[in-house]
Structure formats: C-alpha cells, structure tokens
Amino acid sequence: MNSLLYALIKALRCHRWLRLLACAFIFSSLGNGLTQVVVFGLLLAWSAPPALLTLAFLFATVPGFIGSTIGEKLCSRWSPISLLILTEGLGLLALLFPLLGVGYHSVAALLAVQSTEALLSGMSWPALTLLFKRGLSEAELPAATCLENVIFASQVLLGTGLGVVLFQKTSVFTLLAIDAASFLGSLLMLWLAGRRFSAPSLPSSGEEEASAALRWRTLTVRQKRSLLLLPSLAAVGSPAMALLPALAQQIHPQDAAGLALPLLFARSMGQLCGPMLLKKESLTRFAAHTPRIIVCLGIFLASYGTLPLLSGWMACALGAIFIAHLASNILFAAGTFGVLSSFHLTQTASASGKAWRWQTLSASLFTGIAAAVAAGFGSVAALYAVSSAALVMVALIVRRYRE
C-alpha cells in the first residue's frame, strides 16, 4: 500500500483543511472544464481554421507567465488561502467573457476567457504549492503530488465529461450557469479550509528574501532537474495537445466536435490514472533516471502520432490518447514532487513560480511554432515535426544535467 493514491487517502483522513481544499478545487476544475468545452466547442462549430484552434491553446498558456510572477510576489504578503480565494473570485467574474462571445459571436471574447484563466492559474500555482509545503510533512508530500494531479485531471474528467454530455443537448447559457455555481462552491470550500488551516509562524521578510533568491549557479543538480522537468514535458506535449482539436477537424471534418470532445475526456482519464501507477518511493528515483523520462515522452509522442491513422477507429483513438497522457502525467507527478521536495520552505513559492514560467515559455514557444507549421503544412505535419524536434532537444538537456 505504498501507492500515491493510498498516500493521498491517508493525508485526507488526517487533515480536514486538505479535504476542504480538495473539494474546492474539484468544484473549480468542474467550472474550468466546462469553460473549455464552451470555448473549443464554439470555435469548432464556427469552423475556425486549424491555426486559430492552436492559438486558442496558446492564449490559454501565455498569460500564466505573468500570473506566476504576480502570485510569487503576493505569496510573500498574503496567506496562500487568501490568494486562492482571490483567484477563484476573479475566475467567477471572467465568465462575462464567454457571455459576450456568445452574444456577439466574438472569437476575441472566447480567447479572452482563455487568457484570463491562464493568468489566474499562474497566480494560484505558487500559492497552492506553498500551502502544501507549509501544511504537510515531508512524508506527506507525495500526497500533495497526487492531489495536484487529481485537480489537474478533474478539470477535464468532470468539466469536459459533463460538457460532452450537455454541449449539444442544452444551451451555452445553461452550461455557463453551472460553471458559475461551481465557482461559488469553490469559494465556500476555500473559505472553510482557511478557517481550519493553521500555518506555522512565517519567516522574517529578510530571511525569506534571502532564501527565495534562486540563482542557477548555486542550485544542486537535483534542483536544476526539478525545475527542468515540467518545461521539458511542455515542450513535447503542448504542440500535440494544442493540435488535438485541429487533428480532429482534419480526421473527421463532418463531426469534429463529436470527435474532439471525447478525445479530451480520454486525455483526462490518462492524466488521472498515470500517477496512480507510481509508488511513493519511486518518485525521486524516476526524476533522476534519464531513460525513463525519454521513454515516457516517447510513448506520449508515438501515441499522438498514431491518431491520423485511426480516423475510422474511435475506440483506438481514445485508447491512444489515454496511453499518451498516462505516460506524460507520470512525468508530471515526478516534476511536481521534485519542486515540492527539493527546495526549502522559503524557496517553494519562488521555485514553483519559476518552474511554471519556464513551463509557460516552453509551451508558448513550441505551440507558436506548431501553429505556424499547421497553417502552412497541416496539423499532422506540425505534430510530427515540432514534437519530434522537441523530444530530441529534451533528451540532450536532461542528459546534460544527469545526477
């Protein structure tokens, strides 16, 4: 019973604030997933070109760079719970954008809600990581890693799952009303979690500033690898994930939305199940073993590469996406655990913010390249060329920083 799932269940039984926090983010993820269904479903229904579909993914990542910087700074002044409540409240207000998009048939408004969600996600990531570091013991950190993956996966597992069922059976306004209710539920759960959480005394501002100044030359090899794992995953994974709606449009133009949304659901199932295959003790060893990293990324890319060949085989296409994200989220779990376990408490917010920004830059760069290639040569060629080049680059980088 050393799996990450067992570690999470044990931690949830010990900490009431953690149970409330988990409920809050499940509510929030439900709303975020519904928002994604509305955005991509409308773009597909409006027959948006492949380059625009890919840029929609880009707009959902780039503002996270700014958000993580803001979140990192606010973590030194606000409690993590207060910052999380702020981001959820702003997320509720951001639902005005899709309302405008539907009312005025505005693609810009749909992209604006993607950008706002990315900004708020970037703000919340350092706060969430710092909250785990303060509230959990070192032995319980694998539980935090598992919970982060559950939060990440439930966005599509719950939100997109419900959206797949309801998108073509109910109005967009009904979906947005459910979305708003989920944000209100999240705000309530976060407020209750804040009342139950008791943090240790904070370090002095001078000590925190000194500790939080992360300089690359002074970091250990393990710390450097921890910061590089998530950007490496983004370099290989983001082009493929961004091209997924466009691939569906190219493979099955008669019913692109009917194919793309189940593929997104299969993606989330893989994201949820992948970390459950790991044991607590294997997290550190996995992050330090370069061949395992390359194998996971290779499985991810190979699975996506088979999609153009599976146009008439829906079940096989869903299975390929499931396997791809099973592999990628094993690596995601190793990366998030590395940031949590490799840095001191006063460095956690800075380290997680830096990892998020590097991940955002990596995703933005390679997604932008994929969009340009897709516009000129098609989404299939973009998938093979960009993600393969990224995989070679990642292999060279992780080999350079071997432990």
Residue locations for each model-derived region?
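Intracellular juxtamembrane helix-capping segments at the cytosolic ends
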Residues: 39, 123-136, 330-343
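A single, central transmembrane helix in multi-pass transporters
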Residues: 26, 33-38, 172-174, 215-275
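Cytoplasmic helix-loop-helix junction between adjacent transmembrane helices
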Residues: 113-154
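C-terminal transmembrane bundle of multi-pass solute transporters/carriers
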Residues: 60-91, 250-403
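Juxtamembrane intracellular "pre-TM" segments in multi-pass secondary transporters
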Residues: 1-18, 196-228
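Transmembrane alpha-helix termini and helix-breaking/packing motifs in multi-pass membrane transporters
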Residues: 40-46, 99-101, 158-178, 250-251, ...
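Hydrophobic core of transmembrane alpha-helices in multi-pass small-molecule transporters
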Residues: 26, 106-123, 315-330
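Helix-loop junctions on the cytosolic side of multi-pass membrane transporters
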Residues: 176-204, 399-403
